[in-house]
UniProtKB/Swiss-Prot annotation:
One of its GO terms (biological process) is mitochondrial electron transport, ubiquinol to cytochrome c. The gene is MT-CYB. It is a multi-pass membrane protein. Component of the ubiquinol-cytochrome c reductase complex (complex III or cytochrome b-c1 complex) that is part of the mitochondrial respiratory chain. The b-c1 complex mediates electron transfer from ubiquinol to cytochrome c. Contributes to the generation of a proton gradient across the mitochondrial membrane that is then used for ATP synthesis. GO terms for molecular function: metal ion binding; ubiquinol-cytochrome-c reductase activity. Heme b b566 binds at residues 97, 196. Keywords: Electron transport, Heme, Iron, Membrane, Metal-binding, Mitochondrion, Mitochondrion inner membrane, Respiratory chain, Transmembrane, Transmembrane helix, Transport, Ubiquinone. Its main location: mitochondrion. This is Cytochrome b. Pfam families: Cytochrom_B_C, Cytochrome_B. Its cofactor is heme b. It is found in: Mitochondrion inner membrane. The cytochrome bc1 complex contains 11 subunits: 3 respiratory subunits (MT-CYB, CYC1 and UQCRFS1), 2 core proteins (UQCRC1 and UQCRC2) and 6 low-molecular weight proteins (UQCRH/QCR6, UQCRB/QCR7, UQCRQ/QCR8, UQCR10/QCR9, UQCR11/QCR10 and a cleavage product of UQCRFS1). This cytochrome bc1 complex then forms a dimer. A ubiquinone binds at residue 201.
Length: 379
């Protein structure tokens, strides 16, 4: 008798995606992050759902409702900090996942890659709107500063900002709509994840060598399910340690002060996972130029497949490209650090240099290095 998982219409889909899926035998731990992101999304949706049961999206009560969750709701503090720090884990996994794709040439699967970039934008939008909900000082001023950037768009900018705000400033209408979108977007993200996996399973997974692995495949279960479970345990241990020992490590103390439109915090900055983009935004003196650079810092990923000049797919056997890749990582760390610093000398010039380097590496140096490597190998 044929196993039910191979005949049942619904179980058949799950089976072909998670059990009998042929996977390359050489996948390293860098391929764990896709499943880790799935776990992060699940944790965020569950904790978010329970938080939404107690949260009120009204400017008069939002801050107090978050305090109420932490003090009066059973394990409310745990839910709140799991959700806040879960977002940080989400972005750590997300950036490592994208980095893996860049290093091993996974971007040559253009449909999967482009849906991935769309997912990145959706998750960033969700995180931004979620940061506004506790209605602390940094929530309010972060929302004001970031939404105000849209006013740089010629002709329609000012009207667009007021349309998003639902008034002439960030107020009750803004908070209510941000809560609505913050609740809705994760489910759109979950749907996009399904499309992402659909495209991935059309082509099959890439592997560290970048060489087609059709003759050497193994079933996903039990080999990679066990490997993924180990990844889950490591990540959940790290998340638990963060939540239970230093839950506010990655947050901003200003967000424990209720939002006050009359009092601006000394340093307005987003959460750590947006600091690299924020540093790029601040490094350009012109408002519209800064906004364009901010958007392009992520959108640049869409043209990476076009700029792939190497005859090899992966960077595994390309030492010159590897050096550039790790330089790019160093530049991103530098930008993240600069984004959290005040706008003064020498941080301004460091930020500008790092921003120029970021675009230079991706647009010019990497393609040139690939061409050089092709010539060195007489290809």
């Amino acid at each position: 008798m044929t196993n039910i998982r191979k005949t049942h219409p619904l179980l058949k889909i799950i089976n072909n995606s998670l059990v009998d899926l042929p996977a390359p035998s050489s996948l390293s731990s860098w391929w764990n992050f896709g499943s880790l992101l799935g776990v992060c999304l699940g944790v965020q949706i569950l904790t978010g759902l329970f938080l939404a049961m107690h949260y009120t999206s009204d400017t008069a009560t939002a801050f107090n409702s978050v305090t109420h969750i932490c003090r009066d709701v059973n394990y409310g503090w745990l839910l709140r900090y799991l959700h806040a720090n879960g977002a940080s884990m989400f972005f750590i996994c997300l950036y490592l996942h994208v980095g893996r794709g860049l290093y091993y040439g996974s971007y040559t699967y253009s449909e999967t890659w482009n849906i991935g970039i769309l997912l990145l934008f959706a998750v960033m939008a969700t995180a931004f709107m979620g940061y506004v909900l506790p209605w602390g000082q940094m929530s309010f001023w972060g929302a004001t500063v970031i939404t105000n950037l849209l006013s740089a768009i010629p002709y329609i900018g000012t009207e667009l900002v007021q349309w998003i705000w639902g008034g002439f400033s960030v107020d009750k209408a803004t908070l209510t709509r941000f809560f609505a979108f913050h609740f809705l977007l994760p489910f759109i993200v979950a749907a996009l994840v399904m499309v992402h996996l659909l495209f991935l399973h059309e082509t099959g997974s890439n592997n560290p060598t970048g060489i087609p692995s059709d003759p050497d495949m193994i079933p996903f279960h039990p080999y990679y399910t066990i490997k993924d479970i180990l990844g889950f345990l490591v990540m959940l241990t790290a998340l638990s340690a963060l939540v239970l020992f230093s839950p506010d490590l990655l947050g901003d103390p200003d967000n424990y002060i209720p939002a006050n439109p009359l009092n601006t915090p000394p340093h307005i900055k987003p959460e750590w996972y947006f600091l690299f983009a924020y540093a790029i935004l601040r490094s350009i003196p012109n408002k519209l130029g800064g906004v364009l650079a901010l958007v392009l810092s992520i959108l640049i990923l869409t043209i990476v497949p076009i700029l792939h000049m190497s005859k090899q797919r992966s960077m595994m056997f390309r030492p010159l490209s590897q050096c550039l890749f790790w330089l790019l990582v160093a530049v991103l760390f530098t930008l993240t650090w600069i984004g959290g610093q005040p706008v003064e000398h020498p941080y301004i010039i460091i930020g500008q240099t790092a921003s120029v380097l970021y675009f230079l590496i991706l647009l010019v140096l990497m393609p040139l290095t690939s061409i050089t490597e092709n010539h060195l190998l007489k290809w």
